[in-house]
């Protein structure tokens, strides 16, 4: 709905709402005005307003809405205006327009006529008041001339209304009612400060005269020299626009703004103009395509749209056919004539064109209101801009010059530096602020500022010889300056400075603002996934890991050939294919190989100490991938931590994430650089013992976890003792892709143990078996105390630690840790309550013993309390026992059940693989069942791999690729179970708990058990079979070392004997 005077309606609503509403009347009035402005039919709008205002007004809603719409139709909310008498004034003006044949009266006739009409009441009238009267008369004459000229050229009228409208809206937006009161005071009575205001007014009007002189017809005589600035500035033609007069104060540009604010609200032409009507498009649609060119009112605080985004919002019509197409960005037009000697037309003081800056070639002005100006680039040579360069000639009435005059009060942009492109927008009303020193220097030199809305743009071609100033009428794409950035949004003057920051700031994409990628190449050429492991809490730096180029191996002591860590973190500065590719050069990647980044460790610094714990860090960093290791208080720093991921990609995601770590922007995440120092064997041994102690502690705390998790942890920890004996442990890793599934029996090396292991180490792996006898119990263990030091003992495949299972292990471990923590807290609280009750019980008993002469009533009360305490104490003890019993591991499945479940899972996996369905969950389940079956020893003989590795072999004898594989998986029949005697049947459960949690060996209830190796009746396998198994495993290992994902690249670039 159309509202004539929004402010009057708001004040009327505030008065009406004050007695009937508890809310702020002014805020609610604004809300009501916003509701009424909705573009809806009357009935819908009325119902909508009643619905929205019902919350505030309740019972008064319907009456208020009726009054509101009635007032909108009758307009009784408008203030009562005094009877306006200047009705016949337009008729008088029309008569004067008919009578007058010249555009401007001579100044002398005006003075004489004014003296006759208005005789001076005082003889001692000051000269300044006479000058003020003369200038006011001259303004009235100019207004009449302008009204007459309106019919000749409507375009000038639009521009003039645009400027008047802008000055009017700015004065309204600033709300300077003081200037209005001063202007009224000057017209009614004499102000003592009249002379000072008169000087400012005359200065401002003289500048307005020069500003408006470009719209005076050609036949109009130039103004007298008295109109020019009287401070010593030279007299210049009326067509020259002077922006910075010499008598202007040489400080900042605030004096312009203050002066303009104080005077723009008063009537510029000395007569009461009717208020402009509201713009219908702006009220109904929320925007007006004409913007500042619209002759209707847009309110006190109009919405200003940056014209950079305007073409994408409004489809403009194509440019007129008479105009040439816009040149490509950055192209320069030929030099334009300027002032200088020589025959020919030129706007300069010389009689002909010259190389100086000029505007003889004017920019075309768009004919339509909504059409943006065409993009034209004007080269202005390097000599500084003078006043004569801003001359607009009006030789041809059909064209007009670009308004190269910044309106008074605007903030000036910085001076033009050398070799920079300036693009100028014709309709851009937004200006940048100029620094005080540059502004004062400009005013001292007498040079005008750049043209309208100059935007700083770096040169497109820095290699060119000279790039001068360029003014463009199009709205350019904002680029980045090096030195200048204006203020941001100014709420006091949104139409001037609202888009100042957006013009100069470059917006980078997210990928550019992320941290630099510091991940690099290593000497390894194979795309084999790194070793997966469980989370291990460390208090010392981890043992460094290096990867060789030929065979994927985990070296648990520093390698002398290890490259600098910069290669692990950042890409090489040199292209990989530019280096020499010698056959014996193993430290360089192959030709056109993918960059292999292997650094998976991140250092986190400046962590608050209360947040530097495993739980908090795991919550944040587990979002980006599988965490292998978390180490708090890294290197003794309580505010540092070390995070190790499974792959380099996950570490890169974590370090390049823009999310604040633990909602703290001060926490820093860096790549971890390994020290070049090589730890001694002693430090390695200490680290190994510490890890074993940590795992032992964890196993005692989390003994209720599944046994295969416990087994994986110990196996990872026990893979390290080979460093003490100088051995290198080879870790085989075979990634399971979606197209192949592998069912392997656990090899011999998992059951043999290690040379460095002892009986106490092996006792960590005691697990239950399903078989039970009459008075004996069979336990299985993968460790053998009497073992032969062979090559197979040093090979430990990471099937149990592969990437597909480590994620599940981590999740299960995390959940179990949380549950365990809750249980421990509950148990701790119960224990505290139990201790307090026991103390209270002791205190009451001692009281009874001391006070033997106690009254029988008190004694009965104490006895009753003691009885209740005893019941509660026994109840708490039972609860503590049951909680500890619940934490014990549940009974494992029998061999038959486990084998049946394993077969069913394999069958489901085959069906899904044949149908092409997702097999991720089945693979996880199958891997867990494989671990359990290997622990129970129920994997059948000779099953081997159910499918080939990839089926893409090319007949090169590679580990059975594409031929069904040679892995026959021979079962080891050496004893791996214990026969335990010396206990009765009722003690079976306690014995199971004893062997699964405590590690007490043969001691049980003050008795010594008789333990010996269980010898089954099946004959043991021959030595030849053992040697054959070792060979088959080596064959499989050679196949596993080669990645399946990059077979074709290896086939292409691998050196072969028949190619040499």
Swiss-Prot record:
InterPro entries for the chain: Nucleotide-bd_a/b_plait_sf, PWI_dom, RBD_domain_sf, RBM26/27, RBM27_RRM, RRM_dom, Znf_CCCH
Biased composition regions of type Pro residues, renumbered to the chain: 319-356, 371-384
RRM domain boundaries: 600-674
Record's compositionally biased regions (Acidic residues): 1024-1053
Pfam families referenced in this protein's UniProt entry, alphabetically: PWI (PF01480), RRM_1 (PF00076), zf-CCCH (PF00642)
Regions of compositional bias (Low complexity) in chain numbering: 579-588
Recorded coiled-coil stretches: 809-886
Modified residues (Omega-N-methylarginine): 455
Ranges of compositional bias, category Polar residues: 225-235, 386-402
Principal localisation: cytoplasm
Domain remark from Swiss-Prot or TrEMBL: The RRM domain mediates integration into cytospeckles.
Protein name: RNA-binding protein 27
Gene: RBM27
């Amino acid at each position: 709905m159309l509202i004539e005077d929004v402010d009057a309606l708001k004040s009327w609503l505030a008065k009406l709402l004050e007695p009937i509403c508890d809310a702020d009347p002014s805020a609610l009035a604004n809300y009501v005005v916003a509701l009424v402005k909705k573009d809806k039919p009357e009935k819908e709008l009325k119902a909508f307003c009643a619905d929205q205002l019902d919350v505030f007004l309740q019972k008064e809603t319907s009456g208020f809405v009726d009054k509101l719409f009635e007032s909108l139709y009758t307009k009784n909310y408008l203030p009562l205006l005094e009877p306006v008498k200047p009705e016949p004034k337009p008729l008088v003006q029309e008569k004067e327009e008919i009578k007058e044949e010249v555009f401007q009266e001579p100044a002398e006739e005006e003075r004489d006529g004014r003296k006759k009409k208005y005789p001076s009441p005082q003889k001692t009238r000051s000269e300044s008041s006479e000058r003020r009267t003369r200038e006011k008369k001259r303004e009235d004459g100019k207004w009449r001339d302008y009204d007459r000229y309106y019919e000749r050229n409507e375009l000038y009228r639009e521009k003039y209304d645009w400027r008047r409208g802008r000055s009017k809206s700015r004065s309204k937006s600033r709300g300077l009612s003081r200037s209005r009161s001063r202007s009224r005071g000057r017209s009614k009575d004499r102000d003592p400060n009249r002379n000072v205001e008169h000087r400012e007014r005359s200065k401002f009007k003289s500048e307005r005269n020069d500003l408006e002189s470009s719209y005076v017809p050609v036949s109009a005589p130039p103004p007298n020299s008295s109109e020019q600035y009287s401070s010593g500035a030279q007299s210049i033609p009326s067509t020259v626009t002077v922006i910075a007069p010499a008598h202007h104060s040489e400080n900042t540009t605030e004096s312009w703004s203050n002066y303009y604010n104080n005077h723009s609200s008063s009537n510029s032409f000395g007569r009461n103009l009717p208020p402009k009507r509201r713009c219908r498009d702006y009220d109904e649609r929320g925007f007006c395509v004409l913007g500042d060119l619209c002759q209707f009112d847009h309110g006190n605080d109009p919405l200003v749209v940056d014209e950079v985004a305007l073409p994408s919002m409004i489809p403009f019509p194509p440019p007129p056919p008479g105009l040439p197409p816009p040149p490509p960005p950055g192209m320069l037009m030929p030099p334009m004539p300027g002032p200088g000697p020589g025959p020919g037309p030129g706007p300069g003081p010389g009689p002909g064109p010259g190389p100086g800056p000029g505007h003889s070639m004017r920019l075309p002005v768009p004919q339509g209101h909504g059409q943006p100006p065409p993009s034209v680039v004007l080269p202005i040579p390097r000599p500084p801009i003078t006043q004569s360069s801003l001359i607009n000639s009006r030789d041809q009435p059909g064209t007009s010059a670009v308004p190269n005059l910044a309106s008074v009060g605007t903030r000036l942009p910085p001076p033009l530096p050398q070799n920079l492109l300036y693009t100028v927008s014709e309709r851009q009303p937004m200006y940048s602020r100029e620094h005080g020193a540059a502004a004062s220097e400009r005013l001292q030199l007498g040079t005008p500022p750049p043209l309208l809305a100059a935007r700083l743009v770096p040169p497109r071609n820095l290699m060119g010889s000279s790039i001068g100033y360029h003014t463009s009428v199009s709205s350019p794409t904002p680029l980045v300056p090096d030195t200048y950035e204006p203020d941001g949004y100014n709420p006091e003057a949104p139409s001037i400075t609202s888009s100042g920051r957006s013009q100069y700031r470059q917006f980078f994409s997210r990928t550019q603002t992320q941290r630099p990628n510091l991940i690099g190449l290593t000497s390894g050429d194979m795309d084999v996934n790194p070793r997966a492991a469980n989370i291990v809490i460390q208090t010392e730096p981890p043992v460094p890991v290096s990867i060789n180029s030929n065979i994927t191996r985990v070296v648990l002591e520093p390698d002398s050939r290890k490259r600098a860590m910069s290669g692990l973190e950042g890409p090489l500065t040199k292209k990989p294919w530019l280096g020499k590719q010698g056959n014996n050069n193993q430290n360089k990647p192959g030709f056109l190989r993918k960059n292999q980044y292997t650094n998976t460790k991140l250092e986190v610094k400046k962590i608050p100490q209360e947040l530097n714990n495993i739980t908090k860090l795991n919550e944040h960093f587990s979002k980006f991938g599988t965490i292998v290791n978390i180490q708090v208080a890294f290197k003794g720093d309580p505010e540092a931590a070390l995070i190790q991921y499974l792959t380099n990609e996950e570490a890169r995601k974590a370090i390049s994430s823009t999310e604040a770590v633990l909602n703290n922007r001060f926490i820093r995440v860096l790549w971890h650089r390994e020290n070049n120092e090589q730890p001694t064997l002693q430090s390695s041994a200490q680290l190994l013992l510490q890890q074993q102690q940590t795992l032992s502690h964890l196993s005692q705390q989390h003994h209720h976890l599944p046994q295969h998790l416990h087994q994986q942890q110990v196996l990872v920890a026990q893979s390290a003792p080979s460093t003490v004996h100088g051995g290198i442990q080879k870790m085989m890793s075979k990634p399971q892709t979606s197209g192949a599934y592998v069912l392997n029996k656990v090899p011999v090396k998992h059951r043999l143990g290690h040379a460095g292991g002892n009986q106490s180490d092996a006792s960590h792996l005691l697990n239950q078996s399903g078989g039970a006898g009459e008075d004996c119990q069979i336990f299985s263990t993968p460790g053998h105390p009497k073992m032969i030091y062979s090559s197979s003992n040093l090979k430990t495949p990471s099937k149990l630690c592969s990437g597909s299972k480590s994620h599940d292990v981590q999740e299960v471990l995390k959940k179990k840790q949380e549950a365990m923590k809750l249980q421990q807290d509950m148990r701790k609280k119960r224990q505290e309550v139990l201790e307090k009750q026991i103390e209270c019980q002791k205190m009451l008993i001692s009281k009874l013993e001391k006070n033997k002469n106690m009254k029988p009533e008190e004694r009965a009360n104490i006895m009753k309390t003691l009885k209740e305490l005893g019941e509660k104490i026994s109840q708490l003890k039972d609860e503590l026992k049951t909680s500890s019993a619940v934490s014990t591991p549940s009974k494992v499945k029998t061999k038959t059940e486990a084998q049946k479940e394993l077969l069913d899972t394999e069958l489901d996996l085959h069906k899904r693989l044949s149908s092409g369905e997702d097999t991720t969950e089945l693979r996880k389940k199958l891997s867990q069942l494989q671990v359990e079956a290997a622990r129970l020893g129920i994997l059948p003989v000779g099953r081997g791999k159910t499918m080939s590795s990839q089926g893409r072999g090319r007949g090169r004898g590679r580990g059975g690729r594409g031929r069904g594989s040679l892995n026959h998986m021979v079962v080891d029949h050496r004893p791996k179970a214990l026969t335990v005697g010396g206990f009765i049947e009722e003690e079976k459960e306690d014995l199971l708990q004893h062997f699964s949690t405590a590690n007490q060996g043969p001691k049980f209830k003050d008795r010594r058990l008789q333990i010996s190796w269980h010898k089954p009746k099946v004959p043991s396998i021959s030595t030849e079979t053992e040697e054959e198994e070792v060979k088959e495993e080596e064959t499989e290992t050679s196949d596993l070392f080669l990645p399946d994902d990059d077979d074709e690249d290896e086939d292409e670039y691998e050196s072969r004997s028949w190619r040499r």
